[in-house]
Amino acid sequence: MNADVRNKIISIVLGVIIIALGFWLYESITGPYQQVLIAQERTEQVRTRMISVKDALLYYQQQKGNFPPQEGGLDTLVAFLKTDSLAIANGDSMFVQRPPLKYSPDSLILSPIAPFTRFNYAVNDTSRPPLYELRDPDSDDRIRDLSRTTLLNASSWN
């Protein structure tokens, strides 16, 4: 094998190695950024779903005069949304979901991210005004507080 052929083969091999290392470098820089974007989108989906549950709880309170009881509260809310004529007719516009999610009373109380855990709901109906707390078990996000009336319908992420 003469020197010209050997140099040509080495040049081709080194070119392929440079392209492979360049691709690896690109992926090592953009990969973590893409994961951050995916995590942010999931967080926004969960928060939007929690805001929809808050809106449903406030609608329930407006119609019934109080919040659902603590025991079976979210199930009571789902049953109410399935039977209320306004919620049936306009539920998708009343409780807006972040695409690609769609409104469904059954899935409203579940986190949109796998493993689809139920939101935690607690109510303190002995205080005036009655207070509720809605919490995502997979994060620190919550809406409202059981002890402070100043956090009326406030979310923890704002």
Model segments located where?
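Low-complexity, acidic interaction segments enriched in glycine
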Residues: N2, Y59-N158
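Aliphatic-rich helix starts adjacent to a transmembrane/signal segment
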Residues: G31-V46
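Short, flexible segments with low predicted structural confidence
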Residues: N7, W24-L25, P32, R47-R49
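Hydrophobic membrane-insertion alpha-helices, especially the h-region
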Residues: I10-E27
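N-terminal positive-inside, membrane-proximal cytosolic segments immediately preceding the first
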Residues: M1-I12
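N-terminal alpha-helical signal peptides/signal-anchor transmembrane segments
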Residues: T43-K64
